[in-house]
C-alpha cells in the first residue's frame, strides 16, 4: 500500500478546528480599519483562528486592513467588553516592513474575524487559518499557507507558493514559481504553474492542468488527473484512477504507478516515447499512437516504441487496466 504524508494531516488539524468552533453562542459584532505605509517590500503574517481572510494587491507602499469581529459569548466572559477591547486595540500591527494580523494562543478562541487586506505588489506572506477560507491574489510571494479546516485559493503568486490543509480544498492558479499543495481530506487543483508542482492528498482528487515544470502527484484515496503534461511526471495512487493527457518531451521520464485503479494515457499522434507497462490483475490496451517494436510475454506485460521512442513512459498497476489512446 502506498502511504502519503497527507494521510496524517486531518488528525493533526482536528484539534484546531474544534477549539476554533465549539461551544459558545453568537455575541456582539463590530468592525475596524487600519492603514500602514511601507518604504520597501512587505512581509505579511496573518493568523486567523476562525473566519475568512482575503488578501489582494493595492497601491505600492500602502497596506489597508478591514477587520470584522464577531465575539463569542462564553458563559464566564463579558462579550461586550471583549468587543470593546478588540475595536480599541485590534490584533493588527506594524514593525518595520512586517505587518502582523490576528491574535495568537487562547485569545484566538474569543472571537471570529473576517479580514480584507490590500498590500503592495511586492509582498511575501505567511497565512494560517484554524477554521475558515483563505483567498490570496496577485502578491509577489514567496507565500506559505496553512489551514486546519477550510479552503485555500491563491492566484498569480509571482514566486514559490506552498499550501497545506487538514480538511478542505486547495486551488492554486497561474503561479510563477514552484508549487506545493497538500490536503489531508480534500481536492487539490493546480492550473498554469510555471515551476515544478508537488501535490499530495490523503483522501480526495488531484487535478493539474498546464504545468510547465516537473510534476509529482500522490493520492491515498482518490483520482488523479493531469492535463497538458510535457515535463517529467511521477504519479502515485493507492486507490483511484489515474488519467494523463499530454506529450512527454524528448528527454523526459513519466513514472506512473497505482495500487488499485485503472491508468489511462491520452497521447497525440506525434508522441515519441518508449512504453513499458505492467499490471498485476488487468489488461493493457494500446490503441492510440502507432506502436512499433512491440513485445508482450502475456496480457499483463507490454513494451513498445511509440513514434521515435525518445522519451520513456513506465506505467504499473497492481489491480486495474492500462490504456493508451
Predicted segments, located by residue:
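Bacterial N-terminal signal peptides that target proteins for export
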Residues: 1-9
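Bacterial N-terminal signal peptides
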Residues: 8-19
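Short amphipathic, basic-aromatic surface patches that mediate peripheral association
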Residues: 263
Amino acid at each position: 500500500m502506498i502511504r502519503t504524508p497527507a494521510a496524517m494531516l486531518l488528525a493533526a488539524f482536528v484539534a484546531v478546528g474544534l477549539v476554533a468552533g465549539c461551544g459558545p453562542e453568537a455575541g456582539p459584532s463590530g468592525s475596524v480599519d487600519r492603514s500602514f505605509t511601507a518604504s520597501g517590500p512587505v512581509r505579511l503574517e496573518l493568523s486567523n483562528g476562525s473566519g475568512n481572510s482575503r488578501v489582494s494587491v493595492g497601491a505600492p507602499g500602502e497596506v489597508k486592513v478591514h477587520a470584522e469581529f464577531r465575539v463569542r459569548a462564553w458563559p464566564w466572559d463579558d462579550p461586550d467588553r471583549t468587543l470593546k477591547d478588540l475595536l480599541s486595540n485590534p490584533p493588527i500591527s506594524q514593525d518595520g516592513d512586517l505587518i502582523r494580523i490576528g491574535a495568537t494562543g487562547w485569545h484566538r478562541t474569543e472571537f471570529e474575524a473576517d479580514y480584507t487586506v490590500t498590500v503592495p505588489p511586492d509582498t511575501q506572506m505567511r497565512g494560517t487559518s484554524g477554521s475558515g477560507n483563505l483567498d490570496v491574489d496577485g502578491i509577489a510571494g514567496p507565500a506559505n499557507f496553512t489551514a486546519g479546516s477550510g479552503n485555500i485559493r491563491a492566484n498569480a503568486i509571482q514566486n514559490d507558493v506552498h499550501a497545506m490543509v487538514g480538511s478542505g480544498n486547495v486551488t492554486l492558479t497561474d503561479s510563477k514559481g514552484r508549487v506545493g499543495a497538500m490536503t489531508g481530506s480534500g481536492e487539490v487543483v493546480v492550473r498554469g504553474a510555471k515551476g515544478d508542482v508537488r501535490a499530495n492528498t490523503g483522501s480526495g482528487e488531484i487535478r493539474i492542468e498546464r504545468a510547465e515544470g516537473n510534476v509529482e502527484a500522490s493520492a491515498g484515496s482518490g483520482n488523479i488527473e493531469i492535463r497538458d503534461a510535457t515535463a517529467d511526471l511521477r504519479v502515485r495512487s493507492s486507490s483511484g484512477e489515474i488519467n494523463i493527457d499530454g506529450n512527454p518531451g524528448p528527454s523526459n521520464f513519466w513514472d506512473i504507478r497505482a495500487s488499485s485503479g485503472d491508468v489511462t494515457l491520452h497521447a497525440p499522434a506525434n508522441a515519441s516515447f518508449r512504453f513499458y507497462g505492467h499490471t498485476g490483475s488487468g489488461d493493457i490496451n494500446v490503441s492510440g499512437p502507432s506502436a512499433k517494436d512491440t513485445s508482450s510475454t502475456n496480457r499483463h506485460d507490454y513494451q513498445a516504441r511509440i513514434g521515435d521512442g525518445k522519451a520513456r513512459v513506465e506505467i504499473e498497476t497492481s489491480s486495474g487496466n492500462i490504456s493508451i489512446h
